[in-house]
């Protein structure tokens, strides 16, 4: 394998990478963000090396049965016959060895080259000689017990660091995209003590100076804790290599007598970043003793924005015709995925993201009768689209999906459709072919959110509860905002009195007021691009200042 010609790259660890709809290495926004970051780095020829895990995609594909139940089916992605390449050195397959309490584990490596400066490596323990539990860890992202999660984290952090060493790469910085790669510090300390003849405290400090950390959520479910004894069991082989007590490796994760991976990541990094300004404010309050910088997430516009919308000289008629084409393409996609169609001349409102209680997918379903009255107005008809996957660790999200589907297939059967298997391909159609992008989270729980950024880049108007990135936009004359305490009532009122009338108000066939809002949305999008995010990473996170 020929390495990219990079000097002092950033090594970007992420538990998820969304690079292709068929590649089962992501389940939500964390993976989408990682994919956008690494694609932007490649486009900008910024030296970056991604490190992730090659999951097999068990229970990866969402299927809705005829009676409205959610089923999960296994991915048919075959990494050995795919666009991924097996990583070799001098023609020989590269195998990394991981110490464990029961013996060494073998790790094979695949890669995907994105540019002359950027490559993503995927680690896998799905090897015949490994114990069954290590092989099953590759089944899915968040599906295992605590021991399985810790093994995945050791694979990502320690295995990834060993890989970088094996390839002879000298990183400028190790960037932890969420805390699950934090055990990288174990291997860094071992390297510094053995190769640099440092004492433990000196090696620990040097490792810390080379690590930065991005937190993506303050919600408890995204910040797992483990028993100290469980983590000690897995840490012992690494402590033994350098002749120290396990407690020395784990002390920075102590959190009320448990081990907090988030607290650990905070303590082993020299800088910490939040993913929006408001998230930064809350992070500083919750964890005040750290070097927080707020860098709002961004999206890789060349992946999400239709190229025609980058034309500054586009006329109103041309813009609207492109939008109508995108609406038609979305409608065809919906028919292909569900068997149900709709009139794509209708005002199309979309809610699409991972289904979780705090994202409030049922918010607009509070008063079904009133909603039906509004969307069935013959002069201002409205089509509602929903999409989203449940989370393996959240059984309540499966029940949410099935409840929404039941309502859509009964009371709202002529006006709402749930589209299964929300992935990159579907997201591209939804964020370009909808008219309104609906966002209804409980206040102060959405760290950033990026789906609305994709939408505005294509002139899809936002209707949102202010949270995460949406606090950073003046929505007057651009989109609409909802009070988190009265989401349903606000939505009904805005839809009936502002959104639908604006959309259907035509001059020579064109909704000029709507198009004006579309243009303003597109103008805003550049400020929420991955290009801007990468520049801020370089300036505020990767620099030694």
For each feature predicted by the language model, list its residue ranges:
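Catalytic cores of carbohydrate-active enzymes across secretory and cytosolic contexts
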Residues: 1-545
């Amino acid at each position: 394998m020929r390495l990219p010609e990079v000097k002092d790259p950033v090594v970007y660890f992420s538990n998820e990478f969304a690079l292709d709809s068929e590649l089962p290495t992501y389940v939500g926004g964390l993976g989408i963000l990682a994919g956008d970051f690494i694609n932007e780095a490649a486009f900008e020829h910024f030296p970056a090396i991604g490190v992730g895990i090659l999951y097999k995609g068990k229970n990866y594909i969402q299927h809705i049965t005829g009676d409205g139940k959610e089923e999960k089916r296994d991915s048919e992605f075959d990494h050995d016959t795919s666009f991924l390449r097996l990583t070799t050195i001098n023609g020989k397959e590269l195998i990394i060895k991981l110490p464990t309490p029961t013996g060494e584990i073998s790790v094979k490596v695949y890669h995907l080259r994105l540019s002359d400066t950027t490559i993503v490596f995927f680690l896998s323990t799905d090897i015949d000689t490994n114990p069954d539990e290590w092989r099953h860890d590759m089944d899915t992202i968040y599906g295992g017990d605590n021991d399985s999660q810790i093994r995945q984290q050791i694979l990502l952090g320690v295995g990834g660091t060993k890989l970088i060493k094996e390839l002879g790469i000298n990183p400028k910085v190790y960037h932890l995209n969420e805390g699950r790669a934090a055990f990288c510090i174990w291997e860094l300390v071992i390297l510094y003590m053995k190769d640099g003849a440092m004492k433990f405290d000196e090696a620990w400090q040097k490792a810390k100076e080379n690590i930065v950390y991005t937190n993506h959520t303050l919600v408890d479910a995204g910040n797992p804790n483990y028993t100290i004894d469980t983590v000690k069991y897995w840490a012992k082989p690494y402590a033994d290599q350098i002749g120290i007590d396990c407690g020395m490796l784990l002390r920075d994760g102590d959190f009320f007598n448990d081990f907090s991976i988030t607290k650990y990541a905070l303590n082993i990094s020299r800088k910490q970043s939040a993913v929006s300004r408001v998230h930064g404010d809350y992070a500083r309050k919750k964890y005040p003793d750290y070097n927080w910088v707020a860098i709002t997430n961004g999206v890789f516009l060349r992946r999400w924005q239709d190229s025609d919308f980058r034309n500054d000289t586009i006329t109103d008629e041309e813009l609207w015709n492109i939008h109508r084409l995108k609406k038609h393409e979305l409608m065809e996609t919906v028919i292909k995925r569900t068997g149900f169609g709709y009139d794509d001349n209708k005002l199309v409102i979309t809610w699409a993201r991972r289904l979780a209680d705090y994202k409030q997918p049922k918010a607009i379903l509070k008063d079904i009768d009133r909603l039906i009255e509004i969307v069935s107005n013959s002069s201002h008809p409205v089509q509602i689209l929903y999409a989203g996957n449940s989370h393996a660790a959240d059984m309540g999200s499966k029940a949410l999906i099935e409840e929404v589907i039941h309502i859509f297939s009964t009371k709202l059967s002529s006006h709402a459709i749930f589209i299964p298997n929300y992935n990159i391909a579907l997201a591209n159609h939804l964020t370009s072919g909808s008219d309104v992008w609906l966002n209804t989270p409980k206040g102060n729980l959405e760290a950033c959110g990026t789906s609305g950024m994709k939408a505005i880049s294509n002139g899809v108007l936002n209707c949102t509860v202010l949270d995460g990135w949406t606090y950073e936009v003046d929505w007057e004359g651009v989109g609409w905002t909802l009070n988190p305490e009265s989401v349903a009532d606000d939505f009904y009122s805005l839809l009936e009195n502002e959104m639908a009338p604006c959309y259907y108000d035509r001059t020579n066939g064109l909704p000029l007021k709507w198009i004006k809002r579309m243009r303003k949305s597109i103008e805003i999008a550049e400020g929420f691009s991955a290009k801007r995010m990468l520049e801020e990473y370089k300036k505020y996170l990767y620099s030694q200042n």
